[in-house]
Amino acid sequence: MSQGSPGAWAPLDPTSGSSASPNPFVHELHLSGLQRVKFCLLGVLLAPIRVLLAFIVLFLLWPFAWLQVAGLTEEQLQEPITGWRKTVCHNGVLGLSRLLFFLLGFLRIRVRGQRASRLEAPVLVAAPHSTFFDPIVLLPCDLPKVVSRAENLSVPVIGALLRFNQAILVSRHDPASRRRVVEEVRRRATSGGKWPQVLFFPEGTCSNKKALLKFKPGAFIAGVPVQPVLIRYPNSLDTTSWAWRGPGVLKVLWLTASQPCSIVDVEFLPVYQPSLEESKDPTLYANNVQRVMAQALGIPATECEFVGSLPVIVVGQLKVALEPQLWELAKVLQKAGLSPGFVDMGAEPGRSRMISQEAFAQQLQLSDPQTVAGAFSYFQQDAKGLVDFRNVALALAALDGGRSLEELTRLAFELFAEEQAEGSDRLLYKDGFSTILHLLLGSPRPAATTLHAELCQPGCSQGLSLCQFQNFSLHDPLYGKLFSAYLRPPHKPRSTSQIPNASSPSSPTALANGTVQAPKQKGD
């Protein structure tokens, strides 16, 4: 068994090897001419038949799923189902599920290692999560319980399968839902083997298999032993990856169903026994299990994640959006025929001026209501639906290609720097600093606030001078490259090499795309 004690394993160095890791949110599929011809032929002859048969099997699952829970009360469903329902329906769903994946082209599921019993490991954690085909891992795990969105209950067949599974459901619209999910996971995980195992995809979203995203702590809150489960698709062509940017659902399904044979490897690693410290700290526990799995996979463990609907990467100590919303604003304004350079700023340095959507449209000379609403939504609004025009002025300045980076950073400082007392020097405090980084880089405000505290010299005022701010944004070996890459919206999608890969001695190891290896914790 893997232990949480020091010396149990060595952290993976993502910079070792011949090349750095590519961006985990982007999947590019390059087909040769011969491959294109093959996919065209098989896509017409093979894929439609496979998909049709798979959908027929999917609907055949419904009677078994319905029968297992038919007539049971909510109180009865709070306990694991046993007896004939469990035997007949469980085996029926298991067999039909294997047939479904077989029809989609997954002719072989190769299993390595030994699945632990529910007493040894009440929780299974599977990674990397790269595709909607990943539920295939449920088959060698004997259909463990899963965690899913409550909204999926309304999806035909899928909802019935979730009820059959007695899945733990979380609602995005109910703030108390997450607390109930945590309590339910803890209840099942500490039931002494009464409940089947619970399987998590701790990354929470799909990547391209090239790096592990940051693990969410939900699977580790109970503090019980977990068994890591690795998922690999060792096929000559990666048609299964479904990343934030790359082939969509239908294309991934069509390409995979057009392959003569797809293979999936499922590997059970030794059970990870948490230390006392890890059992009390789910984040530490999650980070250490993530690095164990990354080492076994031979890929880096990163702190990349989704914040809301945006993918976030890490550069040094700062989290930044992979593509700041500022770039999307540029597309909206360009489509409306607006040139940011001719807009009269009218923003007063150091003082906020809150404006309504109507005033925003008048200031930017926009007439189309849809364009106005779309552009206005990019800025943070207060309780009255107003935005600070300083944010608008800085965004327009950043989109004005006629300004140098030095002029732009000076303007940012002038707009948000404040005087503590009459006649004192104007300094950039944490609120203004976090606003600038959030607007220009898409950085979450808490991360920017933490970085601001580190940049301020100990014993001095908790603010940055213009010189200090420009040294940070223009001349810092790491963050200066970040600003130069982000402060101009691209005419075409940037390659990942344009995001800085330098690292400072005090920062975690940075990758070519700006991601970092998870900071070393106990056990390094």
Curated annotation (Swiss-Prot):
**Record-annotated membrane-spanning stretches:** 40-62, 87-107
A biological process (GO) of this protein is: phospholipid metabolic process
Q: Supply the EC number(s).
A: 2.3.1.23, 2.3.1.n6, 2.3.1.121, 2.3.1.67
User: What positions does the record give for glycosylation?
Assistant: N152
Q: Which GO terms describe its cellular component?
A: endoplasmic reticulum; endoplasmic reticulum membrane
- Please tell me whether the keyword Glycoprotein is annotated for this protein: yes
Q: What is this protein called?
A: Lysophospholipid acyltransferase LPCAT4
Q: What is the lineage of its organism?
A: Eukaryota, Metazoa, Chordata, Craniata, Vertebrata
